[in-house]
Amino acid sequence: MSIKLNALFSDSYVDVSQYRDQHFKGNRYEQEKLLKQSATLYVGNLSFYTTEEQVHELFAKCGDVKRIIIGLDKIKKTACGFCFVEYYTRADAENAMRFVNGTRLDDRIIRTDWDAGFKEGRQYGRGKSGGQVRDEYRQDYDPARGGYGKMVQKS
């Protein structure tokens, strides 16, 4: 079967990435199934200062947004550079994956990925210092993400 025809038989025209949530409650098959049906996106590389309104303005261009959950530092309860965007339909979420991934928001190139669906508690960063793990060890200075990485600041 040709590559073009494969798209006709797939669940989605937007591929699911290799990333899997290590804290997912269930087996890999269940997670894959949810990812292929989901209307929820993970959005990463946001500035700590990006507002929910800015996220909504961008993502609403692709369809009706059900809700936005801003990721929070689990200790400080301040934004920590990611969010979840829920759409009412898979088709609208696919549009966002196609057209928003890799674009600029608040002077940062953002990335989107499928999410199996938001569950309470997932809005908190999983890093040791409360934020995102990727911000723990960052060597470069990034004012939009709190300066240097948390572990570098402690050295």
Swiss-Prot record:
PROSITE patterns: RRM. Keywords: Cytoplasm, mRNA processing, mRNA splicing, mRNA transport, Nonsense-mediated mRNA decay, Nucleus, RNA-binding, RNA-mediated gene silencing, Translation regulation, Transport. It holds the Pfam family RRM_1. One of its GO terms (cellular component) is nuclear cap binding complex. SUPFAM superfamilies: RNA-binding domain, RBD (SSF54928). Residues 121-155 are annotated as: Disordered. The keyword Isomerase does not apply. MRNA binds at Y19, Y42, R111, T112, D113, W114, D115, R122, Q123, Y124, G125, R126, Q132, V133. It is found in: Nucleus; Cytoplasm. Component of the nuclear cap-binding complex (CBC), a heterodimer composed of ncbp1/cbp80 and ncbp2/cbp20 that interacts with m7GpppG-capped RNA. Belongs to the RRM NCBP2 family. Component of the cap-binding complex (CBC), which binds co-transcriptionally to the 5' cap of pre-mRNAs and is involved in various processes such as pre-mRNA splicing, translation regulation, nonsense-mediated mRNA decay, RNA-mediated gene silencing (RNAi) by microRNAs (miRNAs) and mRNA export. The CBC complex is involved in mRNA export from the nucleus, leading to the recruitment of the mRNA export machinery to the 5' end of mRNA and to mRNA export in a 5' to 3' direction through the nuclear pore. This is Nuclear cap-binding protein subunit 2. It comes from Danio rerio (Zebrafish).
